[in-house]
Amino acid sequence: MEDDGKSSPKLPIPGKRNILITSALPYVNNVPHLGNIIGCVLSADVYARYCRLRGYNAIYICGTDEYGTATETKALEENCTPKEICDKYHAIHKEVYDWFGISFDKFGRTSTPEQTEVCQAIFNKLWDNKWLSENTMQQLYCDTCKKFLADRLVEGSCPFEGCNYDSARGDQCEKCGKLLNPTELKDPKCKVCQNTPRIRDTDHLFIELPLLKDRLEAYIKKTSVTGSWSQNAIQTTNAWLRDGLRQRCITRDLKWGVPVPHEKYKDKVFYVWFDAPIGYVSITSCYTSEWEKWWKNPENVELYQFMGKDNVPFHTVMFPSTQLGTEENWTLMKTISVTEYLNYEDGKFSKSKGVGVFGNDVKDTNIPVEVWRYYLLTNRPEVSDTSFSWTDLQAKLNGELLSNLGNFVNRVLSFIAKPDNAGYGSVIPDAHDAESHSLTKSLAEKVEKFVAEYVEAMEKVKLKQGLKTAMLISSEGNYYLQASQFWKLYKEDKPLCAVVIRTAAGLVHLLAQLLEPFMPSFSCEVFKQLNLPPQFSLSDERGEVLLASRPWDILPPSHRIGTPQPLFKELENDEVARYREKFAGSQSDRRARDEAANLADQLNKTKLSDAKKQKASSKGGGKPKPQPAADREITMARLDIRVGKIVKAEKHPKADALYVEEIDVGGGEIRTVVSGLVKYIPLEEMQNRMVCVLCNLKPAKMRDIVSQAMVLAASSSDGSKVELVEPPKTANIGERVTFPGFEGEPDDVLNPKKKVWETLLVDLNTKENLVACYKDVPFTTSAGVCKVSSISNGTIR
């Protein structure tokens, strides 16, 4: 989704905020996976859309990083030229980002004449200013392949103490993140032939980072504060400075890259770390011939850069050093937004190894793009690693998008669309004296506060907080509708009902504006249902932010809306199980499974004679008998865990360590439960708590009181802390807690001799994100997953 080129390129405008936004250039060695997408292009897209929403003059520049060893390696794998690999994967990346709705102003590439021109010009400046030196270095040479091995063509064990990762690349260890030289690896191997290379001398050019240290440190010290750098960026950069800057090689013994414009080194190319960040500049030069107005205009342009944490030193140390070394008036990076890693289920996403869900996979799931964007952004790993899981995606779609946001919008618009005498005939009603209605006034005050918090978060590039705040407005809207009882007001007090409905319709409009950076297709659909053109604006200059304090004035009376439609569809358990199975393992594993399935299908088709002899149910007669509970497989489906509410809790009259609770487990049933929680949870905190209750244990007498169920709680690893496992507050009392992928009816009563509970108990735990799980499957309700307050990696009993 790029500027189509018909409009004139944007240039900085004096007196306006001019913001240049870049995303780390994705490499063309594979299809981008979800971790790549949230770490770079999607996060930058949200901020770019926010800037446009606010009326700032912003451009978003990105493209594929195409030179270097990884491209040559991939070309060897696919038996084609590096240029063919780049053409193929550039098109794939573009298609994926278009599907995700990424709003680049220019999505280019680095294998262009413009890249060569800009890169060589910067090199010449560094050479003229004497920031470069020549040196002989030792490099690994493969006698079998008859060539020097670039960093990514070597793998071995990481040399750093405490790491020893056995698949470290020659340029960087993926596990500990440290940058390496290939000769530092222990037990190195050539990735092409798997033979052990030898060390050989070769001459190269280096940038003298130690000589630039004072200028660089002054820039970092000032800008990291004024630009509000993310903490992980500051920590990584300070670690580099603390460990001491070294001269860094900027040339490589390769063919695929920007040629070095120096007679002695004309057979070498620039190292990708030196070349790739310059790609931002060259891609901008493809966008406009007046690119210097963006890149050499620090007085009027703010540069915001987005990337994953492994790219930090190249953008806070290397690229600024290169710019400073030219002694030209470059626009240096002001703000850097860095993400940690997004992990996949039990392990890591890996583009090179093909592990995880990839950008081209998501189109085949039939899950809409707005759901993918929302899930990735709510799960954005801003300060620590986060994990993608199919059950969490399901919980967020069903519990947040469908039950909260979609429910609010559809409820409001559907009521307006009802015919006269049942609704408003699709016309926004007129409303008077909204300020005098206390519930409406209270709502407006909350919304005004939330919008201010949203703007503050987004200005600081705290995208996850901005999204969370916008969703709180939707929650307040749902509460407002429920508390107002508008369906009664429509019959009993039509003027007041008009106030409520017009105010709620204004909130729908406001939510579409606030959420456009995150879910543009959702916002376009809402505006379509409001019968409005998809033009989004939240400008201070036009007073649109102030309207948040008067939501009843956002939409004019007599405005005719369009046709309301459901905005989200529930994701079912069987779909989640199917996706989890489909995307298990690596891409090569999936291909092998598909081939095996196709082979099995072909074999089945050849067994026609057997099929004729055994016509499905021709002889058996009747349905198969249900399997006795005693013989069933032991899975979580056999447990009857329900959402309960403690209506009364008191000390056991005959045991100091026990509580006796009366718990509502739904259907009008109150059960007596005895729990050994006195040492861990104060009595006052037990009152009126939502809890998870195991209801099909055999009743047991505990000090003369029969306990009819068990309250589930988590304990810390040392046993010093215990917390209740709590369902979401909006979960229905009595509903069954489920475990996606484990379907079936529970046993009436668990047979103690079969040890069903004891078998399953060992795999009940809490995760880093405090979600209660069986193995990695969350305790799930219709309102979302069950959690504990603070115990991560705990055990549940």
Swiss-Prot record:
Top EC category? ligase
An example GO CC term for this entry is: cytosol
Which residues are in the tRNA-binding domain?
Answer: 635-738
Cite the Gene3D superfamilies for this sequence: HUPs, Isoleucyl-tRNA Synthetase, Domain 1, Methionyl-tRNA synthetase, Zn-domain, Nucleic acid-binding proteins
**What would be an example GO MF term here?**
ATP binding
Q: Which residues bind ATP?
A: 351
NCBIfam families in UniProt: metG (TIGR00398), PRK00133.1 (NF001100)
Q: What is this protein called?
A: Methionine--tRNA ligase, cytoplasmic
User: Which organism does this record belong to?
Assistant: Arabidopsis thaliana (Mouse-ear cress)
Lineage in the entry? Eukaryota, Viridiplantae, Streptophyta, Embryophyta, Tracheophyta
